[in-house]
Amino acid sequence: MLDKVKNVIIVLSGKGGVGKSTVSTQLALALRHSGHKVGLLDIDLCGPSVPFLLGLEGSNIYQCDEGWVPIYTDASKTLAVMSIGFLLKNRTDPVIWRGPKKTMMIRQFLTDVKWEELDYLIIDTPPGTSDEHITVMECMREVPCNGAIIVTTPQSVALDDVRKEITFCKKTGIKLLGIVENMSGFVCPNCTNCTNIFSSNGGVELAHLVQIPHLGTLPIDPRVGVLAGSTASVLDELPDSPTAQVLRGIVQHLVALT
């Protein structure tokens, strides 16, 4: 039930391991930090990471007459979270489902979760363009969707897959809000200097080539990794870090669009 949700943002990646779930989680926390009520929906059925990243593993969800009730991270209900990870007994339990069952579960997540009034719903998707993505795009025809953010790393092999993701969005009619280049450079935890250990600016160049916004470049920062397993926002814990600066810019961009 998305009738109380004002804005829906989908987070995509062409390849796994680019930090999409971390970006989704920190984006949700940054929006909450900015005074918005936020929902975070994890539809990566085979690799749900959001419960771990927010330290919510072991949380139990229950159903009411209106559907599943999401997990709230605080008493004020400023961040609501839903994931298949809450339905698994153990984090290591695999989800061995064929396409139709995955489709049914995602439709339930999109239609049978009792979201309260939300300013933003962030949908964290699995990598690639699979049944999960097609189901989401079909459901978004019935519910207004602001668009998609694509997360990539600067290497050319990741950028090739991003091009496929861009084509997928165009064919399904989803607006592209921009590209985030993640893992671009390494921030030394001692001196905070940033060193490019991979190629750099691939996301910037691709955004320019396909004429969509480049939302920012996020480095590898061990200090940010330490925040995994908690509901602490980079904006609170590391306000002067490069990651915090980029997240502020993305939030400002989204707010301006919506």
Swiss-Prot record:
One of its GO terms (molecular function) is ATP-dependent FeS chaperone activity. The gene is Nubp2. InterPro entries: Mrp-like_CS (IPR000808), Mrp/NBP35_ATP-bd (IPR019591), NUBP2/Cfd1_eukaryotes (IPR028600), P-loop_NTPase (IPR027417), YlxH/NBP35 (IPR033756). ATP binds at G14, K15, G16, G17, V18, G19, K20, S21. Heterotetramer of 2 Nubp1 and 2 Nubp2 chains. Keywords: 4Fe-4S, ATP-binding, Cytoplasm, Iron, Iron-sulfur, Metal-binding, Nucleotide-binding. Transmembrane segments: none annotated. This is Cytosolic Fe-S cluster assembly factor Nubp2 homolog. One of its GO terms (biological process) is iron-sulfur cluster assembly. It is found in: Cytoplasm. [4Fe-4S] cluster binds at C188, C191. Binds 4 [4Fe-4S] clusters per heterotetramer. Contains two stable clusters in the N-termini of Nubp1 and two labile, bridging clusters between subunits of the Nubp1-Nubp2 heterotetramer. HAMAP family: Mrp_NBP35, NUBP2. GO terms for cellular component: cytosol. Belongs to the Mrp/NBP35 ATP-binding proteins family. NUBP2/CFD1 subfamily. Its cofactor is [4Fe-4S] cluster. Component of the cytosolic iron-sulfur (Fe/S) protein assembly (CIA) machinery. Required for maturation of extramitochondrial Fe-S proteins. The Nubp1-Nubp2 heterotetramer forms a Fe-S scaffold complex, mediating the de novo assembly of an Fe-S cluster and its transfer to target apoproteins.
